[in-house]
């Protein structure tokens, strides 16, 4: 998904966890992953798919979450993970990306 939607490839990946956004009526789950060592490339969007790709600092993201500009659950939970990893409260198990 990272490469397809943003064009970026990652040198390393870490799986943070999984969330079930609507357990009362769905089996949907969302995996939260972190990537580092990013390298830009060409996007491969599906037909009719559109995304705005931009960069922001961790501080900007956390501020947007705090101020209510970010309201979707998956981003808020990812930001919670980010905040805890950056503070040293939680750790991630980084793995080298598979070779293509």
Write out the residue ranges for each language-model feature.
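Short helix-capping/linker segments at secondary-structure and domain boundaries
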Residues: 82-95
């Amino acid at each position: 998904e990272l490469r397809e939607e943003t064009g970026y490839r990652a040198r390393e990946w870490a799986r943070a966890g999984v969330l079930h956004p609507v357990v009362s009526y769905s089996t949907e789950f969302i995996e939260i992953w972190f990537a580092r060592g990013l390298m830009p490339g060409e996007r491969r969007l599906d037909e009719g798919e559109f995304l705005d790709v931009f960069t922001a600092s961790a501080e900007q993201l956390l501020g947007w979450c705090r101020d209510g500009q970010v309201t979707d659950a998956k981003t808020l939970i990812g930001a919670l993970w980010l905040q805890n990893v950056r503070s040293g409260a939680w750790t991630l198990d980084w793995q080298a990306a598979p070779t293509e």
